[in-house]
Amino acid sequence: RVQTDMNYELTDVMSEYRPEHERMLYSLGLAGSAFKKVYFDPNLDRQVALYIPAEDMVVPYGASNLETAERVTHIMRKTKNDVTKLQDAGFYRNVELGEPVTFTTDIEEQKAKESGFSITDDNRYTLYEVHADLILDEIDQPERERPRGMGLARGEDRKEGEALQIALPYVVTIEQGTGTVLAVRRNWNPDDPLKLKRQHFVHYVYVPGFGFYGLGLIHIIGGYARAGTSIIRQLVD
């Protein structure tokens, strides 16, 4: 029954699943890392699974994986109409953002140059969706209940009246142009006593690298290709 339901979801309901997965596989071999985000879209009223390029996922230096990273930022781009619909649905705060501000990265500009096209004005908002462990006293109780296994070390006493400061997982969405916070949400299951963060991202790696991101064909054979080109030019000269 579960298999039948999942097949129905992926083939009939989630129409974007196959093309997004194929885009991810193509990018994976070149870049070495690719991501997919699985979440509930209020505009579509269903689950979606979208491909995310490696350059749109930002993690702290030294992070080893998504599960243990203290902060993961997804750079999103949404049209004004999409943001308005999410505000109307109560997913984002109903605040005035003005007109979208064009924002491009060095990677996007270089990719456009290599592909032979120019970047025109992009009438979309750039949003930073930050999945991070935060201490928000305005939302959480000052004296939090300690999850199982998170007590004080042996021989360590907490001062009387001192609040227990434990960062908990949240999702904070920020509009890049104005710096406006659109949403702050808890990112753990209410029934989870450990308050572990819910995982919305899947990281695919082509060849494991020395850090968080994997190595692709560009990294593996790129150096040999440049060396071969240099040798040929020297022989011709």
Range-by-range predicted roles:
Residues 1-237:
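Extended alpha-helical, oligomerization-prone segments that build pores/tubes and scaffolds
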